[in-house]
Amino acid sequence: MDNVRIGIVGLGNIGQIHVNNLLEGKVERGVLTAVADAFPDKLPEYEAKGLKTFDSGEALIASGEIDALMIATPHFQHTTLGIAALEVGLHVMVEKPISAHKADAERLVAAAEARPELTFSGMFQMRVEPRYQKIRELVQGGELGDLIRVIWIMTDWFRAEAYYQSSDWR
């Protein structure tokens, strides 16, 4: 099978993690070829790694340099970038949440459904953890009965105020 040329738009915290995972060969058949970010001062670091760089997601999408796009931008950009990528025939993986509003999520999903030959996914990494798999098994197996409401409080995922101050969109 051929390798998939991947581009990443958004080089903040999670975007950098995706870059490193791809450059370290942790994604079978995935080859990072290009990145985009709205802050041009970030781009020389990636050019030095041999990647093509773009100053906007739209430019990356139109470049012809990639087969698939990973979207790691602020939430409010997920819908427009995802739809634009799908419309030109790119596979799309978008960070959570897939959109900032329900109506936008529905538009993005509809765009993906209109292109069944493409792969579209949202990054919800917790779904593969054993504890969440067990809960899914219990719910789907009916062992908990008919659920009307679930209140779930996670107390092991603390973020200091500095995290929220690190970007004006958080």
Annotate the PLM regions.
Residues 1-49:
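N-terminal Rossmann-like dinucleotide-binding module
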Residues 2-4, 118, 148:
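Nucleotide donor/acceptor-binding cores
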Residues 35, 69, 150:
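Receiver (REC) domain switch-region micro-motif
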Residues 51-57:
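Conserved SAM-binding strand-loop segment of SAM-dependent methyltransferases
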Residues 57-64:
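Short amphipathic alpha-helix with an adjacent loop that forms part of the alpha/beta core around
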Residues 68, 74-75, 79-127, 142:
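Beta-strand-loop-alpha-helix segment that lines the small-molecule cofactor/substrate pocket
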Residues 126-170:
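Predominantly a Rossmann-like dinucleotide-binding segment in NAD(P)-dependent oxidoreductases
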